Each structure stands twice: as structure tokens, then as C-alpha cells.
């Protein structure tokens, strides 16, 4: 049975700087698109700089945020309502050829140790849902979820060797494994509705395209070892986190920075 959920989301990010900025440019991948599995009812960005919208190479709705000289705070609030229905398979007739996601990317490279581990475990290329979930289960066991053990630049191989990481690391390891087994895979950034959770954060999972000619993608949440469902809101996709992180950029000046993030996700009455 299809379950439809309407989620109200508010995501506030603040950077505070010890001294005035000379200049800063940020790329924001904070605008979800309507498509298979989700419908955006309304969405807005409230930021401290000037926004320049564009569509990036991976088909994401993105914005460049330009900050003027003299600012000591960078503020970005994304908010809106998205209706989800838990559709795990997403047709994508347009966009890049799925086979571009067979190429390794800096944060999702399958090294020799990972390759040997997958071979010893007898894991097959994830050509269907059952095989994809078996691989996700193995990755979740090899890279146990533990906050604070990795950072934004941790690679799949490093997380695999360390045996711990967060959703980002588990997604990178899964993506690297799929590519190594010959199946196009990409990283997904978004939100996960977890009622009752005291510490919400943005989430990451993966999508695979078992048959590139069909151009259908299957969403797999490695952290929760399951298909994506109505709890997931998809923001952006790319080869890895570096290509589609919610906020990334460069700055000149500012000195030390302090980052604070607030995230609220509430299910609205039907």
C-alpha cells in the first residue's frame, strides 16, 4: 500500500566569522525537485547574500550565493513542504547517461582491500533489489554507524578500513562497491524524517541503475538497510558528497568560523 506523507521542513545554517569577510561564494544544493516519489508544494530560500539560480551538471536545482565584503555572518534558511509517497524506483528519461556513474570519484573509489572483501563475501553485482539490499547490509556491517569518527573528506576506503562512519561514509562505500561490480551508482543528499529523534541532521543514501538502457534508478538507504520510502526527501545527486553537498564554497577573510545548524522536519496532518 502506498503511504503518502506531507513533510514540513526548515533547515537553517549559520556561519559566524571572527573578522569581516572580504568575499565569499557558496553553492547551495538545497532545493528539492518534484518527481517520482515526491512533490514539492512550496519551497523558499532565505539567505544573507545574492542568489543566482542554475542547474548543475547532474541535473540539480542549485544556487550560487554571493556574499559582499564586510559581512561577519552567513545565513541560509531553506524551508517548505514536500509530499512523499515512498516510491523507490525513479524513471529518469532525461539527464546524464547513467553510465557516467560507473567512473570512480574522489570520495568513492573501490580499493584493493574493499574489492577482496566483497569477493570473499560472495557478493554479486546488485542487478535487482534483493542483491542491492544484501550489499547494503554488508556495507552497513563493515562501516558501522558512529557519529564523530569521520569528516567531510573521508573516503570510502578510509571508512571501510576504520570500520566506522556516518551515513555519508556508508553511502560512499556502497556507491564505490556498486561501481566496482559494474552497476552505475550515485550519491544522494537529502532529509530523513525520524519522528522523536532529538538530533536531526541532513541524510545521505545511494541510487543504483541496474539497467542503464531503462534509465530507472533504485534508492537504497544503507544506514537503515532498506529501500527509500516516504520518510526520504531527495535534495540532490552526484558522484559523491563533494559534488552535491547541501552547502559548499570558498571565502576570503573572516578568520575563524563557527557553524551552527538547525533542522526541523514535521509530518503535517493528512
Regions found by a protein language model. Give the residues of each.
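Intrinsically disordered, low-complexity coil segments
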Residues: 3, 122-127, 211-216
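Generic structural hydrophobic/aromatic packing signal, biased to beta-strands
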Residues: 28-30, 45-47, 78, 118, ...
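Structural beta-strand/beta-sheet cores of well-ordered domains, especially the beta-sheet scaffolds
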Residues: 5, 11, 26, 78, ...
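Ser/Thr-centric signal marking residues that sit
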Residues: 13, 150, 223
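Hydrophobic/aromatic-rich core segments of domains that either
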Residues: 24, 137, 169-255
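Linear, non-domain "peripheral" regions
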Residues: 1-119
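A short, structured loop/turn motif at beta-sheet edges
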Residues: 70-73, 128, 181, 211-213
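Secondary-structure boundary elements
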Residues: 82-84, 91-165, 173, 241, ...
Amino acid at each position: 500500500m502506498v503511504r503518502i506523507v506531507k513533510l514540513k521542513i526548515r533547515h537553517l545554517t549559520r556561519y559566524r566569522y571572527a573578522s569581516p569577510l572580504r568575499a565569499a561564494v557558496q553553492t547551495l544544493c538545497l532545493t528539492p525537485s518534484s518527481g517520482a516519489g515526491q512533490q514539492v508544494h512550496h519551497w523558499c530560500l532565505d539567505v544573507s547574500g545574492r542568489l543566482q539560480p542554475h542547474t548543475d551538471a547532474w541535473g540539480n536545482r542549485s544556487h550560487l550565493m554571493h556574499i559582499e565584503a564586510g559581512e561577519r555572518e552567513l545565513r541560509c534558511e531553506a524551508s517548505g513542504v514536500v509530499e512523499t509517497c515512498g516510491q523507490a524506483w525513479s524513471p529518469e528519461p532525461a539527464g546524464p547517461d547513467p553510465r557516467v556513474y560507473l567512473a570512480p570519484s574522489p570520495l568513492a573509489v573501490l580499493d584493493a582491500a574493499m574489492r577482496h572483501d566483497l569477493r570473499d563475501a560472495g557478493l554479486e553485482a546488485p542487478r535487482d533489489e534483493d542483491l542491492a539490499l544484501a550489499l547494503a547490509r554488508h556495507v552497513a556491517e563493515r562501516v558501522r554507524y558512529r557519529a564523530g569518527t569521520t569528516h567531510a573528506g573521508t573516503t570510502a576506503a578510509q571508512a571501510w578500513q576504520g570500520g566506522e562512519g556516518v551515513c555519508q561514509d556508508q553511502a560512499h562505500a556502497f556507491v564505490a562497491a556498486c561501481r566496482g561490480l559494474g552497476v552505475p551508482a550515485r550519491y544522494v543528499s537529502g532529509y530523513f524524517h525520524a519522528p522523536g529523534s532529538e538530533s536531526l541532521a541532513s541524510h545521505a543514501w545511494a541510487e543504483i541503475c541496474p539497467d542503464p538502457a531503462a534509465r530507472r534508478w533504485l534508492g537504497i538507504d544503507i544506514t537503515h538497510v532498506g529501500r527509500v520510502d516516504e520518510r526520504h526527501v531527495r535534495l540532490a545527486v552526484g558522484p559523491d558528497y563533494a559534488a552535491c553537498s547541501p552547502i559548499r564554497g570558498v571565502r576570503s577573510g573572516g578568520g575563524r568560523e563557527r557553524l551552527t545548524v538547525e533542522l526541523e522536519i514535521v509530518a503535517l496532518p493528512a
